[in-house]
């Protein structure tokens, strides 16, 4: 990992936070933490909420670099990245294409499957396919239980674990309120883990794996961010060879999507044979007090402030 430069060399930095997605509140929490860390380190950092200001104001106000702490749509999906490309302001995290693909779990799966990477079997239901007959047939394809979720949302928003045929229509309707397409996914029974990545290409580095132990109620939006009921184990307690295999798969998944800067992959380890399955890649992960990238980085010897500086140092443009 390269040495962190003089914080003053970053110039005037905008921490993009808030935005208009369903994850706005979490973004404000992430951005607030990043902003304080950068300011404490001596960076000339300022909060910037795209909900309140047009992005062109970044150029007018003389910002030289952006730390993207936005989550979800219009922040993590390539749109803001594209605007910053046009404004020629370097930004943290993945570029336009990788951000757009990773935001869409169906497109992400297609890339991973083409690369021979393990991900649960799935069925995509386009709006014209969400008929009662087709919806009732999905469990015949994937088995029960199964997961129904919006392909372009995060933080477990709109997700249902379907246990029986009678739940399918309501689960699809809930998901469709957040995204016209619906992703139905094979349920992997086992341990949930997550693994962050820092860097780009051959220099990308997988950080320690975190094992997630949810309460009986499940790992939902409320538990993720607003309670202490979920247990996060780092070190993960997994056998060394199993953790190394997860890190290998995550690095391959990160590179396959063309990610850069930083990211975090979520996986399930199937209990029956200990096989890991990729669920999604987050290209602008949370940086709150409950967030997992800072926890993993700390286990690797990188404190929160140093992590923020390292990510900011990697700010770049696609071309």
Curated annotation (Swiss-Prot):
What this protein needs as a cofactor is: Mg(2+); Mn(2+)
Q: Which residues bind ATP?
A: 139-194
Q: Does the keyword Secreted apply?
A: no
Its subcellular locations are: Cytoplasm
Q: What is its main location?
A: cytoplasm
Q: Which Gene3D superfamilies match?
A: 3.40.50.20, ATP-grasp fold, A domain, ATP-grasp fold, B domain
The reply to whether Ribonucleoprotein figures as a keyword in the UniProt entry is no
Protein residues bound to Mg(2+) 2: 280, 282
Cofactor, how bound (note): Binds 2 magnesium or manganese ions per subunit.
Identify the residues that bind Mg(2+) 1: 266, 280
The protein's matches in InterPro entries, at most eight in alphabetical order, are given as: ATP-grasp, ATP_grasp_subdomain_1, D-Ala_lig_Van_CS, D_ala_D_ala, Dala_Dala_lig_C, Dala_Dala_lig_N, PreATP-grasp_dom_sf
A Pfam family this chain is assigned to: Dala_Dala_lig_C
What's in the keyword line of the UniProt record?
A: ATP-binding, Cell shape, Cell wall biogenesis/degradation, Cytoplasm, Ligase, Magnesium, Manganese, Metal-binding, Nucleotide-binding, Peptidoglycan synthesis
Q: Which reaction does it catalyse?
A: 2 D-alanine + ATP = D-alanyl-D-alanine + ADP + phosphate + H(+)
> A GO term (biological process) for this protein?
cell wall organization
Example GO molecular function term? ATP binding
Q: Which HAMAP family match?
A: Dala_Dala_lig
Family statement drawn from the similarity comment of this UniProt entry: Belongs to the D-alanine--D-alanine ligase family.
Free-text function comment from the UniProt entry? Cell wall formation.
Descriptive protein name? D-alanine--D-alanine ligase
Protein source organism: Methylibium petroleiphilum (strain ATCC BAA-1232 / LMG 22953 / PM1)
Taxonomic path:
Bacteria, Pseudomonadati, Pseudomonadota, Betaproteobacteria, Burkholderiales
């Amino acid at each position: 990992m390269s040495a962190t430069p003089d914080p003053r060399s970053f110039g005037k930095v905008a921490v993009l936070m808030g935005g208009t997605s369903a994850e706005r509140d979490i973004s404000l929490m992430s951005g607030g933490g990043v902003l304080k860390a950068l300011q404490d380190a001596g960076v000339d950092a300022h909060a910037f909420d795209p909900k309140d200001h047009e992005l062109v104001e970044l150029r007018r106000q003389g910002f030289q670099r952006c730390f993207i702490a936005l989550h979800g749509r219009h922040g993590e999906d390539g749109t803001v990245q594209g605007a910053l490309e046009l404004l020629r302001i370097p930004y943290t995290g993945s570029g336009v294409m990788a951000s757009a693909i990773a935001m869409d779990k169906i497109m992400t799966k297609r890339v991973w499957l083409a690369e021979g990477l393990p991900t649960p079997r799935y069925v995509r239901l386009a709006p014209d396919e969400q008929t009662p007959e087709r919806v009732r047939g999905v469990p015949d394809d994937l088995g029960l239980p199964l997961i129904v979720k919006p392909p372009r949302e995060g933080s477990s928003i709109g997700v249902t674990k379907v246990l029986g045929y009678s739940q399918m229509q309501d689960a699809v309707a809930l998901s469709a309120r957040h995204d016209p397409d619906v992703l139905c996914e094979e349920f992997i029974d086992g341990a949930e883990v997550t693994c962050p990545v820092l860097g780009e290409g051959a220099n990308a580095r997988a950080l320690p794996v975190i094992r997630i132990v949810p309460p009986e109620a499940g790992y939902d939006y409320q538990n993720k961010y607003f309670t202490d009921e979920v247990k996060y184990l780092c070190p993960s307690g997994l056998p060394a060879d199993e953790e190394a295999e997860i890190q290998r798969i995550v690095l391959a998944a990160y590179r396959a999507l063309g990610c850069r800067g930083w990211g975090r992959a979520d996986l399930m380890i199937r209990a029956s044979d200990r096989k890991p399955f990729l669920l999604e890649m987050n290209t602008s992960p949370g940086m709150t007090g409950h967030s997992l990238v800072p926890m993993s980085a700390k286990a690797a010897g990188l404190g929160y402030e140093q992590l923020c500086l390292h990510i900011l140092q990697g700010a770049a443009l696609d071309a």
